[in-house]
């Protein structure tokens, strides 16, 4: 499985348009374009996440969680997680560690460089039975048991 983006390059700096607007940052808070291919046989749905493992919480920080993307989905356009693009029926964006749904960009403590890992997971089930209030950890727990494959792009920001 392969993940690509018109907006991100693995190991490069996260562009300003994908940085949080708040907490001392003035980014545009727009979710990036993501596309994937080489999907494994038997894929019934996808989950897309953005996770910061470097957040000073002891458990990282979930910036974006999208569940129940249909098996024929291959692209999330820029702005999908920011309310700029309509979501298909049944697709949910669950609660991030900012306490709300949708995409929220990078906002590390000043002077720290963090990794932002954008991942698509191919699942062997059509849907994860969660609601919008589910945490990234709860979604991740469910993904663990149903993942056929995954692919990631890691962007950096400080």
Curated annotation (Swiss-Prot):
Checking InterPro entries in the record gives: PEBP, PEBP-like_sf, YbhB_YbcL/LppC-like
Q: Does the keyword Cytoplasm feature in the UniProt annotation? A: yes
Compartments, as annotated in UniProt: Cytoplasm
Keywords, comma-separated and alphabetical: Cytoplasm
The answer to whether the entry has keyword Phosphoprotein is no
Signal sequence, start to end: none
Instruction: Give the SUPFAM superfamilies listed for this entry.
Output: PEBP-like (SSF49777)
GO-annotated cellular components:
cytoplasm
One Pfam family in the UniProt entry: PBP
Task: Report the sequence similarity comment from the record.
Answer: Belongs to the UPF0098 family.
Quaternary structure (record): Homodimer.
Classification via PANTHER family: UNCHARACTERIZED PROTEIN YBCL-RELATED, UPF0098 PROTEIN YBHB
Protein's name according to its UniProt entry: UPF0098 protein YbhB
What's the gene?
ybhB
